[in-house]
Amino acid sequence: MLHIEKAEYCSDYKIKVFFNDGLVGIADFEKIINNDSLFLVQQLKDINLFKEFDVKLHTIVWTNGLDFAPEFIKSCIEK
């Protein structure tokens, strides 16, 4: 099962993510934040709130309670 072991804020809406399958990459959440109408996602437009996350339950969880599945986060990795 895919999970996130570690995550570090990079810049803007980007987070460096370390997966248990060995992949390390930069996930860019800017398009999601700008295009999703869900209130919890829209709150992350505040960059200070975006920076407030932790790795819990094998994924990234923001202080407003929002989280995404590790598989979705992996799809956000810059190629």
Report residues per predicted region.
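Motif-centric detector for short Cys/His coordination patterns
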Residues: M1-K79
